[in-house]
Amino acid sequence: TGLKVSNPKQADITYLYEQLPKLHVDFYHATSKAEFRKAYRAAMEDTGKMGDLDFYFTLRRLASLAKDSHTSVGLTQELVAQLSAIPAQFSYVEGAWRVSVIERDHADLLGGEVIAINSIPMQEVERLASPLFSHDNQVWLRYYLSQQLNLTNLYAYLGIATSPSQMVSLTIKQRSTDEEHT
């Protein structure tokens, strides 16, 4: 690879970089070798200041360059224990991100359209998150994104929150009244 490996995270990134093209049937079908190498170099440079969850998202970004729906980096129990999430889940239904699970106190928002997270429109959130989720099409992107869209760690990694512990502001259009609530 030509880059010096000086810590365990760099060793893992290098392993992924070397093995993905060997183990994937056609890794470079939609990504050039130059693009993959550039992403690898960027990941290697960032490891010094990277926590475990940022490292996880960095590995996801590298693996997603396969640009298919079956190549990904999974979560370990140790990582799951470090995740922070808001008490809601979202699904892409009827052409919009909607609240699919929420606490009883906010049941009136169930099925409501999520307009923005921390004032960032959902279309922009989706665009920012897209490089972290290997996918062949928008259906797969939205499916995989829905599994992590309630994670404040994801918001922090994408830059739509300053930290995972930051209070999250959701803008939701209530389904029954069309009123927007933040």
Enumerate the language-model features and the residues they cover:
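Flexible, low-complexity junctional segments that flank or bridge functional domains
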Residues: T1-T182
